[in-house]
Regions:
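Pre-NBD coupling/linker segments of ABC/ABC-like ATPases
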Residues: 2-23, 27-109
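ABC family nucleotide-binding domain
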Residues: 108, 112-322
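Conserved beta-strand-loop-alpha-helix hinge in the C-terminal portion
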Residues: 326-345
Length: 345
């Protein structure tokens, strides 16, 4: 009878492990992990697994019979449960990144970004939350691309992964020929400095520097010297006469334009913008979008914008609709709208 019970416990634990099989090397390894947990302090354990709102929780629950009665026993149980659960999560979830391809080289003459079966989950304590659930897509050079989706859809996570701000949990992320999933942190930092520019909803200007000096920060971080000059950039953003202003002397729209200038000073191959008009009024928002369109058309810079506003998506020639962590639709627009003609509300 005891043997049957033991087999049942191992079987239940094995089933729970199989739920995250993609990051496990083999069933043998998984069962070894289970046996280690069962031998820990010679105390039997049970595994509890629950699924709620797309989240998976893995908890080790020690059996009641191994502890003293009353509050003292409860504290012993809670302490051991915490130790076991944490160790279990590390053993199971901290596996090597799984890549989909071997020795694959994307067509750089056409596709600047290519994703293959990209997944992303976040681990908080012992809670795993899947955000991206298998993304496959190819994006062309020199396109104006909008990533569109509601709050919580995974659009910002998607942007962070293709820009090198975050790493995928699984799959391949090819950007400019490099598989970002395989880059070490130091190489990822170098990649961001050399090849991409960022514009965020928060301007993050240095308050003790002028507009020009803030833009030059971006220029100094880059090794490229063949891009636009600072004067040309401020001409592009329509602020050539305001280069010596400090952030406190500028409106929100002007500060956002300076943040664009800072990104352009790196002469990036790709310009990423996360909700760049989110904190601006309609007039300033349209001006910022006009600048992004101008950069895309005149300098052939690939521009990728994240937004929740479907009207802004009309200015793009490629629109990626993301919903619940997957690409719901991929739209190509042969005649993008002018930022001044789109509805704003």
């Amino acid at each position: 009878m005891a043997k049957d019970k033991k087999k049942t416990e191992v079987s239940e634990v094995s089933i729970n492990i199989q739920q995250i099989q993609p990051i496990s090397k083999s069933k043998k390894d998984d069962l070894e992990i289970v046996e280690k947990k069962k031998k820990l302090k010679s105390i039997k354990t049970e595994t509890f697994s629950s699924t709620q709102a797309g989240q998976r929780e893995y908890i080790i629950i020690p059996n009641e019979q191994n502890f003293e009665p009353g509050i003292k026993g409860l504290k012993q149980k809670q302490k051991l449960q915490k130790q076991l659960t944490s160790k279990y999560s590390k053993d199971i979830l901290n596996k090597e990144h799984i890549i989909t391809t071997q020795n694959y080289k994307p067509d750089l003459n056409k596709h600047i970004i290519e994703l293959k079966n990209v997944k992303k989950s976040y681990i908080t304590g012992d809670l795993e939350t899947p955000v991206l659930k298998g993304i496959d897509i190819k994006l062309d050079k020199s396109d104006f691309i909008v990533i569109l989706g509601p709050s919580g859809s995974g659009k910002t996570t998607f942007l962070n992964i293709i820009s090198g701000l975050d790493k995928a949990s699984e799959g391949d992320v090819f950007v400019l020929g490099s598989n970002l999933s395989l880059l070490k942190d130091s190489h990822m930092t170098k990649f961001r400095r050399k090849t991409v520019g960022f514009v965020f909803q928060q301007y993050n200007l240095l308050t003790n520097l002028t507009a020009k000096e803030n833009a030059e920060v971006g220029e100094n971080l880059s090794s490229k010297k063949n891009g636009m000059s600072i004067d040309e950039i401020f001409e592009t953003i329509g602020m050539k006469d305001q280069m010596n202003k400090y952030p406190h002397q500028m409106s929100g729209g002007q500060q956002q334009r300076v943040s664009i200038a800072r990104a352009l000073a790196k002469n990036p191959d790709i310009l990423f913008a996360d909700e760049p008009t989110g904190a601006l009024d309609e007039e300033m928002g349209r001006k910022v979008l006009e600048i992004l369109v101008k950069v895309n058309k005149e300098y052939k810079t690939t521009v990728i914008v994240v937004t929740h506003n479907p009207n802004i998506a009309k200015i793009a020639n490629t629109v990626i609709h993301i919903k619940n962590g997957i690409i719901d639709n991929l739209e190509h627009n042969a005649h993008p709208a002018d930022p001044q003609t789109i509805e704003w509300a």
